[in-house]
Structures are given as structure tokens and as C-alpha cells.
């Protein structure tokens, strides 16, 4: 019996059922959490019917007995909760609902972002990071947070990287890159004028360019050699529920894992040296 069939039948009994059927259906729909640990006698008492009525009810619903009914009910309950989380947050949600809905929204946004990643492109970008003399990072406003996170990850594994939150310093970088460098630009929507200007400067220098931005055909995407896309939902970002920076970090971390597989021995040595330096601080 399908999961949605059971709930549909219970809801139908509220309208056309009689006496015992209605009482059991109402309890099962309104008291989902309470039912989980109940045996036949406990359900009968809670719903105000006899134990025999419960057994008869389950058989009328198409089950061999109470145990089979309960297994299907709990499966149906799992789907019900998942569907109830699909809606957006609203001012009337209690704390438990806020936690659950937020978690579901983060999971969905992350999964959708990872689905946008092309393995061949990831391989190519990871190899470019390995081969680059320097990694030059561009990011302004809140995108600078992501750029700094990337910068810190790279220098920890002894990869030469440049970043400054100062726009004028970034402009200086973009004017002085060469063909041996690799630019990684971070922009939420791909239409930040300063970022696009610096990408144009880097392109004129013959420097390879990567852009980490929302999926689509914005100007930054057209200017870059390769793109790391992430899932962008205007409604979620405008309300501040999920920020682009979270998803951008997840996408880069995924790329970074690939990079680490290409430089494993060097990474281990670099991290060991870092730990030793920290220990020496006492």
C-alpha cells in the first residue's frame, strides 16, 4: 500500500466515516507523534474505542493486522514530515519548526549547488591550481568573506595566494598578473562592476580566470575561462535565510578536496609544519 494512500484514506474517513472510524482517523491524523510508541490497547484508550475496534479498523484499511498497519503508518509519517518542511519559514513557526525547516532548506540548497558542478570542469580547475605560480583572488563586499576563506585554505597548504579586502589592492593585482597566474573571482550574481573590470584586466594579461558565481549567463560567466556555479534562490537570499557565501564556500570546499588529492604529500608536509609552528607558540 502506498504511503500517500493511507493518509488519504484517514482524511476521507473524517468526512464520511462513522463513529469508531472517525474517532480513530481523527486521533491518527491529529496525534502523529503520540502514536509512535502505542500498542493496541493504548491506542484504543487514547481514541476512546475498544481494542477489538482497533484491530477491526486496521483490517478494514487493508492490513493483516495492527503491526502491518503501524509500519505503513510510520513510513507515511516520515513522508508527511518531509513534505511539511518543504514550505518556507513563516512568523507563526515555533522554534522546532524553524530549526527543522532551516535544516531542510540548507540541505536542499547545498544539494542543488553540488548537482550543478561538472566533474570535468572541476578536474580542470584543480589542475590549474596545481600548476599556477600564484592564485590571485578577487572579491568585494560580502564576497570578500569567501575570498578570504579560500585564501586561508590555500596558504595553509603552502600554495602561493594573494588577497586583500581593499579594492585598490585588488586592482593592483589585476594589473600585474601574468600567464603563469590563476585568478579566482567571487561574485554572488556575476554582475559586480568592479569584479568584471578586474576580470577584463586579467584577461588582457593572458591570465587564466575562474569565477565562482550563481548559475546562469551573467557577465562574469562570459568573461571567465571556467565557472564554479552555485544554486541561487533570490527569495532565500533576500530574506537572509541562506546567504550566497555559505553555498560558495561549500562549492569551493568541494573543489579543494579534489585539489588535495592531487597534492597529498605536499599538503601533509605543509600542515605538519603549520602544527609545529603553532606548538612552538606554546
From Swiss-Prot:
Keyword set includes Cytoplasm: no
DNA-binding region: 40-59
GO molecular function terms listed in the Swiss-Prot or TrEMBL record: carbohydrate derivative binding; DNA binding; DNA-binding transcription factor activity
Keywords: DNA-binding, Transcription, Transcription regulation
InterPro entries associated with the record: Homeodomain-like_sf, HTH_RpiR, RpiR-like, RpiR-like_SIS, SIS_dom, SIS_dom_sf, WH-like_DNA-bd_sf
Biological processes, Gene Ontology terms: carbohydrate derivative metabolic process
UniProt name for this protein: Uncharacterized HTH-type transcriptional regulator in aarA 3'region
Organism: Providencia stuartii
Phylogenetic lineage: Bacteria, Pseudomonadati, Pseudomonadota, Gammaproteobacteria, Enterobacterales
